[in-house]
Curated annotation (Swiss-Prot):
Source organism (scientific name): Escherichia coli (strain K12)
Signal sequence extent: none
Record's subcellular location: Cell inner membrane
Keywords assigned: ATP-binding, Cell inner membrane, Cell membrane, Kinase, Membrane, Nucleotide-binding, Phosphoprotein, Transferase, Transmembrane, Transmembrane helix, Two-component regulatory system
Catalytic activity field: ATP + protein L-histidine = ADP + protein N-phospho-L-histidine
One GO CC term on file: plasma membrane
Pfam families assigned to the protein according to its UniProt record, in alphabetical order: 2CSK_N (PF08521), HATPase_c (PF02518), HisKA (PF00512)
Boundaries of every Histidine kinase domain copy: 243-449
Name assigned to this protein: Sensor protein QseC
InterPro entries tied to this protein: 2CSK_N (IPR013727), HATPase_C_sf (IPR036890), His_kinase_dom (IPR005467), HisK_dim/P_dom (IPR003661), HisK_dim/P_sf (IPR036097), Sig_transdc_His_kin-like_C (IPR004358), TCS_sensor_his_kinase (IPR050428)
PTM sites of type Phosphohistidine: 246
Amino acid sequence: MKFTQRLSLRVRLTLIFLILASVTWLLSSFVAWKQTTDNVDELFDTQLMLFAKRLSTLDLNEINAADRMAQTPNRLKHGHVDDDALTFAIFTHDGRMVLNDGDNGEDIPYSYQREGFADGQLVGEDDPWRFVWMTSPDGKYRIVVGQEWEYREDMALAIVAGQLIPWLVALPIMLIIMMVLLGRELAPLNKLALALRMRDPDSEKPLNATGVPSEVRPLVESLNQLFARTHAMMVRERRFTSDAAHELRSPLTALKVQTEVAQLSDDDPQARKKALLQLHSGIDRATRLVDQLLTLSRLDSLDNLQDVAEIPLEDLLQSSVMDIYHTAQQAKIDVRLTLNAHSIKRTGQPLLLSLLVRNLLDNAVRYSPQGSVVDVTLNADNFIVRDNGPGVTPEALARIGERFYRPPGQTATGSGLGLSIVQRIAKLHGMNVEFGNAEQGGFEAKVSW
């Protein structure tokens, strides 16, 4: 198997064709041999019987047997006569030979019991013969006509060889033609291989499928789809890296400034304490940003979900509200959960769906004023997270969900990645996320399925 795998496709196809053609030729030869021998036996048996009947119609009483047997048949001047093709002898009932062909007929042993076709041998020989025995109409004579089996086999072999040898001779010609045609048909594959070998790693240009066999076209189309996905991934990663570098630069610069302020505030404990508090807050913001960047990067690399389960959304929302409750209380914000539907379940990855709800709640609490309420409502086909904040302008609403985008004028800290993470998780679960301003004021996010 390893040897054949190292061979080219053209050589392998040629070997397969050669093996199949050889096996087919051998099977055809066997079938042709069987059919031909059966037909030859039937034909020559009929010939023997007709010749014996013809001899039985002779007036054997008037034949001068001595003179007849003395006259050995002459060879034809032109052509070939096989002495094994046919022989005969005529006996009386007591076994006395009265007539033969002057050749092999002299050695035919007499048998008074045989009638019809029988196999036997000549006197003093081991070669098998085919005989037909017949009694003359007057009952006085026994007529036997024989033919050597080897003659029949030679005749059958000559017929079969005449039919099959031309095909055997044509096989090398067919192989040459096949190799030429295979080389011609595989030329598009060689061209495709060259295009892949010379392809720029950053190229997004699809492979040309012109002239490619239909059996290989799905491979080319799959490669083009792979190249498109790879290019999109590379563009996404480059954009992500660029945005991440830009977003990390500001908090890191701020951390450096606060560190320098703390170092220069040895004589002012109050300023030093304030700088350290701001440094701690900056570290928290940077940590949150890095966590969100890593989360978004992992989500981008997912094409399908693993470890999915049936998740009761009622339990999911209740646990998420409990998780955010302490933070909301510190900000003097009340979080309320309203269940307009029960026993609603969705198939998904528990940790990711929990992250989706937590990000929506965190965003609502972060941008809501003190003393306001965040409402979480579960319906039969969606759930809604609504705050009492100022909402967003139509221009900003159109860009909500873009990575690193934050509406202008925001005082609350943030990275602009939370809602991007929400959209990505929802997409992985086949859900739809809609952002908008609530009719009674505030910003709302609706997750529907």
